[in-house]
Amino acid sequence: MRVSKVKVKDGGKDKMVLVHRKTTGAQLVYSGQPVSNETSNILPEKKRQSFDLSTLNKTIIKFDTAKKQKLNVDQYKIVEKIFKYPKQELPKQIKAEEILPFLNHKFQEPVKYWKNGKEESFNLTLLIVEAVQAQDKRKLQPYYDWKTWYIQTKSDLLKKSIENNRIDLTENLSKRKKALLAWETEFTASGSIDLTHYHKVYMTDVLCKMLQDVKPLTDDKGKINTNAYHRGLKKALQNHQPAIFGTREVPNEANRADNQLSIYHLEVVKYLEHYFPIKTSKRRNTADDIAHYLKAQTLKTTIEKQLVNAIRANIIQQGKTNHHELKADTTSNDLIRIKTNEAFVLNLTGTCAFAANNIRNMVDNEQTNDILGKGDFIKSLLKDNTNSQLYSFFFGEGLSTNKAEKETQLWGIRGAVQQIRNNVNHYKKDALKTVFNISNFENPTITDPKQQTNYADTIYKARFINELEKIPEAFAQQLKTGGAVSYYTIENLKSLLTTFQFSLCRSTIPFAPGFKKVFNGGINYQNAKQDESFYELMLEQYLRKENFAEESYNARYFMLKLIYNNLFLPGFTTDRKAFADSVGFVQMQNKKQAEKVNPRKKEAYAFEAVRPMTAADSIADYMAYVQSELMQEQNKKEEKVAEETRINFEKFVLQVFIKGFDSFLRAKEFDFVQMPQPQLTATASNQQKADKLNQLEASITADCKLTPQYAKADDATHIAFYVFCKLLDAAHLSNLRNELIKFRESVNEFKFHHLLEIIEICLLSADVVPTDYRDLYSSEADCLARLRPFIEQGADITNWSDLFVQSDKHSPVIHANIELSVKYGTTKLLEQIINKDTQFKTTEANFTAWNTAQKSIEQLIKQREDHHEQWVKAKNADDKEKQERKREKSNFAQKFIEKHGDDYLDICDYINTYNWLDNKMHFVHLNRLHGLTIELLGRMAGFVALFDRDFQFFDEQQIADEFKLHGFVNLHSIDKKLNEVPTKKIKEIYDIRNKIIQINGNKINESVRANLIQFISSKRNYYNNAFLHVSNDEIKEKQMYDIRNHIAHFNYLTKDAADFSLIDLINELRELLHYDRKLKNAVSKAFIDLFDKHGMILKLKLNADHKLKVESLEPKKIYHLGSSAKDKPEYQYCTNQVMMAYCNMCRSLLEMKK
């Protein structure tokens, strides 16, 4: 039963209950009110309804269970009525055998409870029979007494549990924390714990023999009653407990006082609950599984692993407490703030890793160490192997030819990333509020090794000014690349740009849904099946994709997204009337819908819990309320499967914005957006089309006005953040913007406006590629050579319809999808993938098939649209007959499917094949591979960031140490430096000088060498035993450090990287995270989810060495004509989300060794 983040009635009003934790204990409080202990007021009276439901569920089985067991459901309802509606009349007659199957196992036997200090018991089946025979409910009084006793006992336990849910620091530790601390010294010294004593005291061997003696119950068909068997195992454990802890009358005080024995016992309980669950579970044990899990050795080994994992987690928690300087006045609000900060830090760490990889590609693409490290950066500069052309791709101009100026430029980009990374890696308390306040950077020279340079005194100030001045050009170029200029008249575009003032920044209200979610949600609501459950939002603007050709649909999508983000959102989230109207409409329609579906339950509708927007509410106030409720509901339902239930507050917010955007688009000024028409002559050459587009772009530039309000080009901190943003791609910039918006809400006093504007400015040109090859290549041959690895050898691309060479037969065409892979360093990897299989290359056969398909594709799209409309009409006709309850069904939809279903599917497959060929001809598939690679590496870097965080917390736990680590450091390397270079001063050893300090902050000097050597030895032993689990194996220790660096620095993309495949790195990452089993297991799920997001089903399996291997990688399915995955295969009409050929490429990406 939940007592937190739920609503209760108090004084006639609904109030949200929260748990407020402190170091002295916890208490229930009301949300939005001064903190006051309401625990006794809420429990049990204000949760009476929940307690009643709890007792009902303990008494009888659930309705679904009765159906599943094929019991008499009518008889179930008769029995249920006795307990659920105690004021209603009893049934006229009932037999014991009609009651017993519906009682939970506990109530099928005599039930014991305590009344007035005396043990009582009753047989519920007999009570019911007697009560029915006498038609006297007073016969059920023993059951009502049990219910009163149960609620009071449960309530007292809940109160005690809440009170004990304190924040554990060093004082007032829980029994579990005390036990873990008792084992900690042994564990950190050896990397293991010896449980021999507790195996003996707990008599584990005896327990396992008792468990093995429990015989499974079978039905008349020989099928095991799993639930009854698992209850039997639980009963055996309960019978074993008195032998260890004694009974209430004769307790074993010594064992009961042993905290470690108590925790050992709890682990045994959890073991049985996990492998032999009584609650509904997907686990299905075979006979071999049962034999294995009931072995004494299996139980002992598992418990040891679980306890070791818990000890590590406790060490990390202690380090976290020390790191954040949590004191006795710490509350749950402080913990929420820390959690929010950590989420932001981890996200920003991944962003910094991506930016650092881009710096490495510019400065020294063979560097496998940390390019942001000062020593490694200097070594790379000395190679003088910088890539000025690549630098210009990011900043618009190449590096200076003057050596000093060039190095200042490079130190500037390093400083912009390195300082942000260092700030977030070592943040404490409120440090994140100033994480972006960077004005100077290291710029050492021979004469001044510690020289600092201000960003306002660099070339980056002029470049920032230039970027601000060119916003109209960037905006116009975005309209061109998005397809707006190709599919809308200049007159319409000019009218739109001059009539409305587009905002540089979208709304900064957190939880405002993104365009994709609103767009897809609107399409689903507007075009859903119009039956009795049709949800009417009176929408008009969300037209289906099938209504448009591919390119015109993309242009319309771009325009709608632009209008939503830069016009609608800023206005809608400040126009109180429009916002309130949408809120009121959605709530009204939701109530009407509930009444239509179930007229008897007028009070029960999905958004009943959402309070109306009052006249006193501002938009910000109301959204803050909705946001608070949404977060609470997310927490409440976080343990459920995501698809199992849709959160009402999330759905409410989505509908408000869907309706609001639909209303906004009804203005006549937007009519043209729904009717994209090609503006270029179809027969024109690619060069002619490009020239025409450039002319159209130039003609609207003057009208493209986006004016920044907060970004200042003379502010050094703004310039530094601008440099940082220029090193990111559009995906990372968008994610950073979204995270900043969310994070800003937790740090209200810190202003983010200028950061958000700078991000939006950089987004305008982030992934823009020059269209003239001369801006990127020194010759035509070099440009064409860039394409050759991806094209079939010997193919004559000069005859491929201006796809790769212009109509003059020699001028190359720039392909943005290729150039972006060059910019972000994945080109060599993509070449390797494509070279794995000749079918991966773009071939003459691909061109011929694509060229042929082009001639009929528009007609086929129209044919698919017509078929779909016919099916919708047939389905609606069937629904109408259903509503009219006609006896004889016409089955219009089924007849349509029988006649046209296969044709419809063939057309869909043909269109999908054309789209795949079109993607190959324009290298879109390479861009997707590039994006997937960056996401995979970024996700792995995110796990390494967690490893680094926990590494640091491990050190912070050793608060009494004379020396501390400030982050990840190769202790083996330092140890060698200390012992092999005795003549050097310690302060000259880079790693020690910068990574290790004394607690009091003094510099380490020669006089403490012996102490330092002993410290390093002790620290290495501590980490190797307790964290890395490599004992004294120096080779394995170094391998783990190398793997950490390999993943953290994106070394998978470098020329000199070690010979790893991505699946190898996933396995190595799991090994790195072995210290936290939950985190280790999360690795594979994270990558399965990532491929799912990209439209693929990734299945992994463990080989004989317990290493993950790819079992299969297949496309996800899209179901058509009302079919679903639940239908029999012969009734499924489905196509693939992605082509199998693309899945094969992605599998090569995973398995290919670099």
Curated annotation (Swiss-Prot):
Keywords linked to the UniProt accession: Antiviral defense, Endonuclease, Hydrolase, Nuclease, Repeat, RNA-binding
Give the domain of life. Answer: Bacteria
InterPro entries, per this entry? Answer: Cas13a_endoribonuclease
EC numbers: 3.1.-.-
Stated regulation of activity: Target RNA acts as an activator for non-specific ssRNA degradation.
Q: Where is this region: HEPN-like fold 1?
A: 330-466
Could you say which cofactors this protein requires?
Answer: a divalent metal cation
The answer to keyword Isomerase applying to this record is no
One GO term in the molecular function aspect is:
endonuclease activity
Q: Quote the record's cofactor note.
A: Pre-crRNA processing is metal independent, while crRNA-guided target RNA cleavage is dependent on divalent metal.
Q: Which GO terms describe its biological process?
A: defense response to virus
Q: Outline the segment boundaries, as ranges, of region: HEPN-like fold 2.
A: 923-1154
Functional summary from the UniProt entry: CRISPR (clustered regularly interspaced short palindromic repeat), is an adaptive immune system that provides protection against mobile genetic elements (viruses, transposable elements and conjugative plasmids). CRISPR clusters contain sequences complementary to antecedent mobile elements and target invading nucleic acids. Unlike many single-component effectors, this CRISPR-Cas system targets RNA. CRISPR clusters are transcribed from pre-CRISPR RNA (crRNA) and processed into crRNA by this protein. Cleaves linear target ssRNA in a pre-crRNA-dependent fashion, preferentially before U residues.
Q: Which family does it belong to?
A: Belongs to the CRISPR-associated endoribonuclease Cas13a family.
Q: What is known of its domains?
A: The target ssRNase active sites are probably within the 2 HEPN-like folds, and the 2 folds interact in vivo.
Quote the record's miscellaneous comment.
Answer: Part of a type VI-A uridine-preferring CRISPR-Cas system.
**Name of the protein this chain belongs to:** CRISPR-associated endoribonuclease Cas13a
Source gene? cas13a
